[in-house]
């Protein structure tokens, strides 16, 4: 029987590993990865319902820079990122920026709504599904985050936990480049 010190070290190592590579229910494809997209392709449009039952489409955000985040309440790295996303929404929304969360929660709104209230999430959240995840390359690890430019094209993809400054630098780069006339 292992000692409590060994069990404690193992638990700490497991936690650190999950924070570095993200959460995954798939066989060990989890990784921390950043891809800046050189040739930007259109972000796939989708239609999902928010916590109030309203239909939300990604295309509703055209003209804005969007941080599209696939997450779940049980994902440790996701819990680290959410306060950053709340801050980004507050700081940059008046410059044409929006955060859109896509919860991949198995327990649906029953788990997500209380979490959103507890964390005072100020951005739109929808419940994701398999078809939407497949449209985005088969989201296998959480968090997976896409930065979408004002023209609705994928500019960057993050798989796993990225740094706050990494997100913020990319958001500012997209906000400051290629502003469209009349963009919010």
Give the positions of each predicted feature.
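Active-site acidic short loop of glycosyltransferases
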Residues: 61-64, 94, 121-122
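Thiol/disulfide oxidoreductase modules built on the thioredoxin-like
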Residues: 114-122, 127-172
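Hydrophobic beta-strand core positions in alpha/beta domains
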Residues: 67-69, 101-103, 146-147
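Conserved hydrophobic/aromatic "anchor" residues
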Residues: 46, 61, 70-71, 115, ...
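N-terminal targeting signals for export/organelle localization
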Residues: 1-45, 49, 170, 179-184
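Short active-site neighborhood of thiol/selenol oxidoreductases, capturing the structured segment around
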Residues: 56-79
């Amino acid at each position: 029987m292992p000692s409590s010190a060994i069990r404690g070290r193992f638990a700490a190592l497991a936690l650190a590993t999950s924070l570095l590579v993200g959460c995954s229910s798939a066989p060990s494809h989890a990784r921390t990865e950043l891809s800046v997209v050189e040739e930007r392709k259109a972000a796939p449009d989708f239609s999902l319902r928010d916590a109030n039952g309203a239909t939300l489409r990604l295309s509703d955000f055209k003209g804005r820079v969007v941080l599209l985040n696939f997450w779940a309440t049980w994902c440790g790295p996701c819990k680290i990122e959410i306060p950053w996303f709340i801050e980004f929404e507050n700081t940059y929304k008046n410059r044409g920026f929006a955060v859109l969360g896509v919860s991949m929660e198995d327990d649906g709104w029953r788990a997500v709504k209380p979490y959103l209230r507890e964390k005072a999430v100020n951005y739109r959240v929808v419940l994701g599904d398999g078809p939407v995840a497949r449209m985005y390359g088969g989201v296998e690890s959480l968090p997976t985050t896409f930065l979408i430019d004002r023209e609705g094209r994928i500019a960057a993809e993050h798989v796993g936990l990225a740094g706050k400054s990494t997100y913020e630098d990319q958001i500012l780069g997209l906000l400051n480049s290629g502003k469209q006339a009349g963009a919010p």
